[in-house]
Amino acid sequence: DMGALKAAEKMSIAMKDKSFAKKCRTLFEKGSEWMDENLFNGEYYEHKITDPKTFEFLDMNDPDVKIPGFQLGQGCLVDQLVGQYMAHLCGLGYLGDKKNIQTTMKSIMKYNFVEDFSRHFNNMRSYVMGDEAGLLMASWPKGRLEVPFPYFSEVMTGFEYCAAVGMLYEGMEEDALTCINAIRRRHDGAKRNPFSESECGHHY
C-alpha cells in the first residue's frame, strides 16, 4: 500500500532510521509509478484481474479467456481512492499522479452518481430507492463482467462519505455537497432514521 509506505518513511525519519526511510521512499516511488502506468485507464483506476497460477494479467477483452467470478474488472469503484483520502487526512500528500487522482474523482461522480433510482435494478440490499439519489458502489462504463462482485448495484453511506471527502480535497465542493445532501435527504427522519445510517450507523 502506497499510503503505508509513505507513513513508514515519515516514522523512520522520526526514528532517525535513514536506511529504512530511503527503502520506503524508493518502494513508494516505484509502486506509485507502476499504478499510474498499469492501472489508470485514462478516466479512473481499474482492477486488473490476474491468473491465480501465473499472476499474469488476464485479457478481459478476449472472449476465450475465462474470467473468475465476483470481480470488479474494468468497473469504476466508488472507494478506489479511499487510501488517497486517508493520506490527505494524515498529511501524506498524493499517492499517485495528481491529475490522475483528480480525473478519477470526476469519473466517480460522472459514472456512479445516480439522481433517480426509480428504474435501477438491484438484486442485493436496497439502501436507496424511488426518486432518491446516491453514489453506486460500482459502474461499468467500459462494459460489465458477466459475474461481477455482489454489491455493485448498492449504495452505502460510508463509501459515499469517503468519496465526498475525496472530492473536497480535489476542489470538487459542489459535487461533494451533492453527494452528502443526497445521503441526508434519504435519512430525513421520515423515511429513515437520521441518526443511524445503514452501513455507517448501528449496522457496524
PLM regions and their residue ranges:
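Extended, hydrophobic alpha-helical segments in both membrane/secreted and soluble proteins
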Residues: 1-8, 31, 35, 159-163, ...
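Well-ordered alpha-helical scaffold segments within catalytic/enzyme domains
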Residues: 1-18, 83-96, 161-172
